[in-house]
Structure formats: structure tokens, C-alpha cells
Amino acid sequence: MTEIETIGFHYVVEAAGCDPEVLGNADRIRQIFLEAAKVGNMEVKASYFFKFSPTGVSGVVIVAESHISVHTWPEKGYAALDVYTCGTKANPEKAVDYILEQFKAKYAHVSEIKRGIEEDDETFTHMIMTWEEALRKNGNGSG
């Protein structure tokens, strides 16, 4: 079977059962994302995070390879996470795994989108693979 060439990988993650204290802390999420970029072998260019009142955070880290972004709902223990990278140097899956661990997520619904698949007629398409994971039981880190 031939490997499909792609311009980038986009991970769209629904993280549930997360620690509300982490999800409500913009500074902590910034630290997590900056470290996730390192773990995923990405070069950070800029970051911006905003804390909503009374709760929730939205933020983005721009990396040379593309971006890592999040929107959180601490009251629901939920975070919507995107990690998109171009090229072959970065490892977005490692970044996603690190973020889920730091958010103390119990469950994740993950879609990996292979983007920029070139077709014969100079157009591009994408391919999606989706899975769900139970990450933690009873908050003790065992899966």
C-alpha cells in the first residue's frame, strides 16, 4: 500500500472530563501549549490567550508549522482543541497527547485530518480518521 502524501496534519480534539482549575487558567494553558509545541518539535512564533468572565479561556500558539488552539468550558470540564502542522518535522500527535495529559482529560474524541492531498487535476482534498479514547479512570491516570 502506498503512503498518501499530505501537506499537513490537523488534529481536532473534543477533550472531556478535564480539570476545571486548569481549563479556567489562561496562564497555565499558555505554559502547557508552549511546552506541547516543544514536545511536538514545533517552533513557536507567537501566542495569545484570553480569559473570559466568569469562566473559560480561548487561546492560540502560532508555530512555524501552523498553530495550536483551544476554547475551554471549565464548568463542563470540556475543551475544544486544534493542532495543525505542515511538513514532516513536527509531531502533532505528541503535542495532543501532552495537552490531554496536562488537562487531566478522562476522554477524548480525536479526528486526524490529512490535509492538502493533491489530486491529479491540481486540486486538493483531505482524509479524516476518527477515534475515541478513555484516558483516565477515577482521575488516577490509569487508562
Curated annotation (Swiss-Prot):
Residues carrying Pyruvic acid (Ser): S66
Keyword flag Nucleotide-binding: no
Protein name per the record: S-adenosylmethionine decarboxylase proenzyme
Family: Belongs to the prokaryotic AdoMetDC family. Type 1 subfamily.
Pathway named in the protein's UniProt entry: Amine and polyamine biosynthesis; S-adenosylmethioninamine biosynthesis; S-adenosylmethioninamine from S-adenosyl-L-methionine: step 1/1
A biological process from GO: spermidine biosynthetic process
Enzyme Commission designation: 4.1.1.50
Co-factor remark: Binds 1 pyruvoyl group covalently per subunit.
Post-translational modification: Is synthesized initially as an inactive proenzyme. Formation of the active enzyme involves a self-maturation process in which the active site pyruvoyl group is generated from an internal serine residue via an autocatalytic post-translational modification. Two non-identical subunits are generated from the proenzyme in this reaction, and the pyruvate is formed at the N-terminus of the alpha chain, which is derived from the carboxyl end of the proenzyme.
Protein's organism: Thermococcus kodakarensis (strain ATCC BAA-918 / JCM 12380 / KOD1) (Pyrococcus kodakaraensis (strain KOD1))
